[in-house]
Design a protein with these regions (language model features):
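Alpha-helical scaffolding within the catalytic cores
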Residues: 18-20, 53-57
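Catalytic metal- and UDP-sugar-binding loop of GT-A-like glycosyltransferases, i.e.
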Residues: 8, 71, 105
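A generic signature of intrinsically disordered, low-complexity regions enriched in glycine/proline
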Residues: 15-16, 31-33, 58-59, 117, ...
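ATP-dependent adenylation/pyrophosphate-handling site
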Residues: 2-47
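Short glycine-rich catalytic loops that host catalytic nucleophiles or stabilize transition states
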Residues: 36, 70-74
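Metal-dependent de-N-acetylase/amidase catalytic core
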Residues: 1-4, 27, 43-50, 61-62, ...
Length: 205
């Protein structure tokens, strides 16, 4: 199986699907990641760009990621980018990666970049209908990103209600937490949603 994780920012892939990515890669499946914005200028305690790139590469290598597609769209300003450009960037990743399964943000996430990524991804997965030579995507999943998905503020959108789970075991959860710790400034003390205890508890639900 081939998986493509499409996310707005570095660390979103690990927060949302890190344990599953680790399991799939170690089972011999191919896991690619598409990151729309590889900078973090809007973060309060941001690392330097080269530090963030290093963290992204180290974390994803540990998880067993095959390839990272890196976009340069503006951080927390993706709503200023023409929708078509976002779609075309994801389409290019789909054409090269040839995934069976694509996973991205839920559109009701509180982060607007997550919304823009999700909406663009929804359109990009239809590429095979227009381009018969492009491999058909078999499944399309949303994932939960702690501290963004669980807020459920926008009642106009259906909130995240998972109906598909991947059994990753303690080893997978531990791998996710270790991969997250490779990103500077991401982890927080409990009860923050990006704490080791919270992530462990979420995986047990």
């Amino acid at each position: 199986m081939k998986y493509l994780i499409v996310v707005a920012h570095p660390d979103d892939e690990t927060l949302g699907a890190g344990a599953s990515m680790w399991k799939w890669a170690h089972n011999g499946d191919t896991v690619d990641v598409c990151i729309m914005c590889t900078e973090a200028k809007a973060r309060a305690f941001r690392p330097e760009d080269n530090e963030l790139e290093d963290d992204t590469n180290v974390s994803n290598k540990f998880l067993g990621v095959n390839k990272i597609y890196e976009g340069t769209f503006p951080n927390i300003e993706m709503n200023t980018v023409p929708h078509l450009k976002l779609v075309q960037f994801i389409e290019a990743a789909i054409k090269e990666s040839e995934p069976d399964v694509i996973i991205t943000h839920h559109p009701a996430d509180t982060n607007n970049d997550h919304l823009q990524t999700s909406m663009a991804c929804q359109e990009a997965i239809r590429l095979f209908q227009r381009r018969p030579e492009v491999k058909r995507v078999k499944e399309f999943w949303y994932m939960e990103v702690p501290s963004c998905t669980e807020w459920k503020i926008n009642n106009a959108m259906e909130s995240f209600n998972p109906n598909c789970y991947v059994e990753v075991g303690k080893e997978g959860v531990d791998a996710k937490i270790k991969a997250l710790s490779m990103y500077r400034g991401v982890m927080r003390p409990y009860p923050h949603p990006r704490s080791a205890d919270y992530i462990t508890g979420l995986a047990a639900m």
